[in-house]
Swiss-Prot record:
Protein name: Bifunctional protein GlmU
Keyword Cell wall biogenesis/degradation attached: yes
Entry's cofactor comment: Binds 1 Mg(2+) ion per subunit.
EC numbers for this chain: 2.7.7.23, 2.3.1.157
Source organism of this protein record: Sulfurimonas denitrificans (strain ATCC 33889 / DSM 1251) (Thiomicrospira denitrificans (strain ATCC 33889 / DSM 1251))
Record keyword Cell wall biogenesis/degradation present: yes
InterPro entries given in the database record: Bifunctional_GlmU, GlmU-like, GlmU_C_LbH, Hexapep, MobA-like_NTP_Trfase, Nucleotide-diphossugar_trans, Trimer_LpxA-like_sf
Required co-factors: Mg(2+)
HAMAP family: GlmU
Annotated binding of acetyl-CoA, by residue: A356, N362, Y363, S381, A399
Subcellular location: Cytoplasm
Reaction equation(s) it catalyzes: alpha-D-glucosamine 1-phosphate + acetyl-CoA = N-acetyl-alpha-D-glucosamine 1-phosphate + CoA + H(+); N-acetyl-alpha-D-glucosamine 1-phosphate + UTP + H(+) = UDP-N-acetyl-alpha-D-glucosamine + diphosphate
Primary role: Catalyzes the last two sequential reactions in the de novo biosynthetic pathway for UDP-N-acetylglucosamine (UDP-GlcNAc). The C-terminal domain catalyzes the transfer of acetyl group from acetyl coenzyme A to glucosamine-1-phosphate (GlcN-1-P) to produce N-acetylglucosamine-1-phosphate (GlcNAc-1-P), which is converted into UDP-GlcNAc by the transfer of uridine 5-monophosphate (from uridine 5-triphosphate), a reaction catalyzed by the N-terminal domain.
Amino acid sequence: MNKNKISIVILAAGKGSRMKSSKAKVLHPICGKEMLYYIIKTSRAISDDVSVVVAHQRDAVVESMSRYFNDINFVTQDAINFPGTGGAMKGVNIKNERVLVLNGDMPLVEKSSLDGFLEAQGDVVMSIFNLQNPSGYGRVIIEDAEVKKIVEQKDATLQELKVQSVNAGIYAFSKKIIEKYIPLLQNNNAQEEYYLTDIISMARNDGIKITPLLVNENEYKGVNSKKDLSDAEIIMQDKIKNSLMESGVTMQLPSTIYIEEGVVFEGECIVENGCRITGESKIINSHIKAHSVIEDSIVKNSDVGPLAHLRPASNIEDTHIGNFVEIKKSTLKGVKAGHLSYIGDATVDEGTNIGAGVITCNYDGINKYKTVIGKNVFIGSDSQLIAPVVIEDNVMIAAGTTLRSGKVNSGELVVSASKSRIIKDFYYKFFAKK
């Protein structure tokens, strides 16, 4: 589809007071990305001219979205002098002959449904959806495939109250309609705001046809509260996981699994129940076992868990990570770490075995230090490696060893535990004193 046919304006200037949050509404996350991210991503799929209107927490919104997109026009609304959705359009320069106006709080909108606005004919296209219970909504009265009027519930007749069509709040206009009617908008209403919907009534009064376009309520329903946010995340999770399963990922009890938008799977992968995979994690030909957490990490040809935790910047390949093992900012290749270990700020090479209870002590209260472990190293259970430490290839660390900062040369054995003492009949003597 030709991306030059339509411009898109996304309204993202509002405070979102119903969110009851100090954070701008459009910056609230859904599956790891701000809700505004999704509608921008979808918009860029059909247009080369995308503008985002900002006002409330402008700098935070611009900074956040600039991390993902470098070709978006940010327009700052003069919310003091020109508040409202109509006021938001006053500073926008439209490149193409048609413009689609979207809301920043609609993260679930699909490209396929936006295509309908490109195909619809007419200078003004107005989105509608049908509700089983439209109570509280203004009704859209349609006759002969044309919007005849929009009537608020309090002003509707008994017959009009039976209508289930309501305004979905998305519009497509020809450029000439915007150029003609935006300067004519007035704010003589109770809120003293400039409303984009007034263009509909002005155009209709001038005999211009208003074309209705039926859209999916679940996609176009705005996210206005924390409850809406939760509902949207459930729907988005289903979309993400269904797409992954269709591409070949096996999921056990997918309703218990959480996977964020930026996660990538390649090859044959299995994800068991209760797992959480976030950030820009990449899973390649691997098995993620039950209740494991993976954050911004790469897992290749490996198995992880159950109940393992890969924190950000972990990179494992051809490796076994067992239960209750935590990895942070470390690279492991061809390694076995079966249980109850913490590996942080470390590089561990192939053939190395990490025993139960092994800890890399990487932090002295001020600075972080690296641990480097070579090939074919055997580290016994309950050992502490106090970084900075370098362990060359083919080394053995005895169980219970505390290895203090330094270097261990190839072929060496490190033992720090003293020989155990056995005191005969001590138990009986000790408790006899009680």
